[in-house]
């Protein structure tokens, strides 16, 4: 099964949430918007899918001002633009160009990627999948088991490392995460490894001391390897919906994010949460996940996502 087919299948719950409550999407925009109940149904469907009230209002206004042809086509266009954090790229999309530029954006700017997120989002497994993704594209990879507070985390990453043939820098359970990060950053620099993924503890976003520790980890990485980490990626579980967005805001305040990885999109009807993440943080979504297999985590592309959401085939190359 192709990635697009897996994505389409994984977004089925969100698709049902929107199509089941939005009313008929195959009617003309001008016809649909003559009835207030059609507009209200569409608003309700988008908000229920966790698109967010502010983004929903913008989408409705966009359709009202610019929408021609079928309502579904206008809705897809408006959603695609909402998912573009880069205004220039959004303009290209609007003009009808669809260059595959968003996929190239997943190449890390530097050599160290700090991966953060609360417990239960699949952070350690996501790191393993990311490692495999970049190895398959010719990059050398290292892992740092910086989640020293969760007893099994280091062991789990170690098992993944053995399976993938990736070196793993580990500390002791309950040890200093910053020390692990410092040693790993120094080792990566000495060995000339292309990419180091630093796992971190599953921090609760309402615990000030844990957020402060994140800042410390970032500082010591920079001390061991100046200019790093060039990337800080937050892993979010799509099932958490709006609560996940609040998590993202707290993490972004503590240590500015450069990207978000959204997992478990196949387990929720709230796939619309991607819209407020991009809109309110201005941070790109790097990867999305719709399953347990390594190939079920792939670079995010807004046009591909929206087409899969509405079960519309990709245009022929």
From Swiss-Prot:
**Quaternary form?**
Part of the signal recognition particle protein translocation system, which is composed of SRP and FtsY.
Q: Give compartment(s).
A: Cell membrane; Cytoplasm
Q: Which SUPFAM superfamilies match?
A: Domain of the SRP/SRP receptor G-proteins (SSF47364), P-loop containing nucleoside triphosphate hydrolases (SSF52540)
* Catalysed reaction equations from the record: GTP + H2O = GDP + phosphate + H(+)
Looking up Gene3D superfamilies in the UniProt record yields: P-loop containing nucleotide triphosphate hydrolases, Signal recognition particle SRP54, nucleotide-binding domain
Name the gene that codes for it: ftsY
Look up the EC number in the record and give it: 3.6.5.4
Positions that bind GTP:
117-124, 199-203, 263-266
SMART domains in the record:
AAA, SRP54
Similarity remark = Belongs to the GTP-binding SRP family. FtsY subfamily.
GO MF annotations, alphabetized: ATP hydrolysis activity; GTP binding; GTPase activity; signal recognition particle binding
- Coiled-coil-forming residues are none
Say which enzyme class the record assigns: hydrolase
Keyword Methyltransferase in annotation: no
**Descriptive protein name:** Signal recognition particle receptor FtsY
What highest taxon heads this organism's lineage? Bacteria
- What does the entry give for GO biological process? protein targeting; SRP-dependent cotranslational protein targeting to membrane
Record keyword Repressor present: no
What does this protein do, in the record's words? Involved in targeting and insertion of nascent membrane proteins into the cytoplasmic membrane. Acts as a receptor for the complex formed by the signal recognition particle (SRP) and the ribosome-nascent chain (RNC).
User: Where is this protein primarily located?
Assistant: membrane
GO CC list: cytoplasm; plasma membrane
Question: Topology versus the membrane, per the UniProt entry?
Answer: Peripheral membrane protein
| Keywords per UniProt | Cell membrane, Cytoplasm, GTP-binding, Hydrolase, Membrane, Nucleotide-binding, Receptor
């Amino acid at each position: 099964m192709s990635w697009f087919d897996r994505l389409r299948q994984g977004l089925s719950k969100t698709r049902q949430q929107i199509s089941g409550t939005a009313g008929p999407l195959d009617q003309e925009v001008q016809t649909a918007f003559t009835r207030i109940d059609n507009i209200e149904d569409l608003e309700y469907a988008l908000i229920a899918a966790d698109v967010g009230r502010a983004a929903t209002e913008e989408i409705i206004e966009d359709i009202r001002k610019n929408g021609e042809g079928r309502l579904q086509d206008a809705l897809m266009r408006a959603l695609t633009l909402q998912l573009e954090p880069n205004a220039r790229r959004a303009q290209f999309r609007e003009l009808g160009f669809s260059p595959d530029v968003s996929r190239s954006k997943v190449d890390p700017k530097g050599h160290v990627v700090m991966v953060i997120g609360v417990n239960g989002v699949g952070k350690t497994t996501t790191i393993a999948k990311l490692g495999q993704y970049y190895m398959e594209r010719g990059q050398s990879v290292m892992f740092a088991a910086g989640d020293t507070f969760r007893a099994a985390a280091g062991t789990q990453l170690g098992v993944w490392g053995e399976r993938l043939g990736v070196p793993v820098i580990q500390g002791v359970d309950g040890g200093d995460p910053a020390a692990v990060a410092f040693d790993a950053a120094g080792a990566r620099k000495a060995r000339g490894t292309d990419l180091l993924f630093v796992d971190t503890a599953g921090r609760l976003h309402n615990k000030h001391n844990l957020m402060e520790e994140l800042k410390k980890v970032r500082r010591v990485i920079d001390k061991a390897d100046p200019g790093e980490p060039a990337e800080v990626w937050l892993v979010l579980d799509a099932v958490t919906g709006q609560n996940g967005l609040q998590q993202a805001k707290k993490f972004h305040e503590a240590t500015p994010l450069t990207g978000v990885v959204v997992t478990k999109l196949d387990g929720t009807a709230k796939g619309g949460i991607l819209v407020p993440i991009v809109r309110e943080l201005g941070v790109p979504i790097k990867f999305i996940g719709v399953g347990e297999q390594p190939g079920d985590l792939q670079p995010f592309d807004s046009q591909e996502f929206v087409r899969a959401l509405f079960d519309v085939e990709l245009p022929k190359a």
